[in-house]
């Protein structure tokens, strides 16, 4: 699942959230469930993506804009080398989340935030 067993036991486990600037419109609902979504493909290594399972994904239209689609990451799929698709369970209560000024710096299209 991407969790480090020893960090959990030692009480040092932090969940990591990932935020993306979504401009391609590749995200989509999967099947008949309104809650399971695919994020579209992102420039994230498979190793890093797997470590994010259990964390949360947030899609934004801009760095300063609120999230519009978000939820708990439940799986990842390798799309192409170095790119992955996140499968997540939508959580309406997370919509309109902003990235705080103290959360770090955005890369070109993403930022990870420990919580």
Predicted regions and their residues:
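Structured alpha/beta reader/binder surfaces that contact nucleic acids or chromatin modification marks
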Residues: 6, 12-115
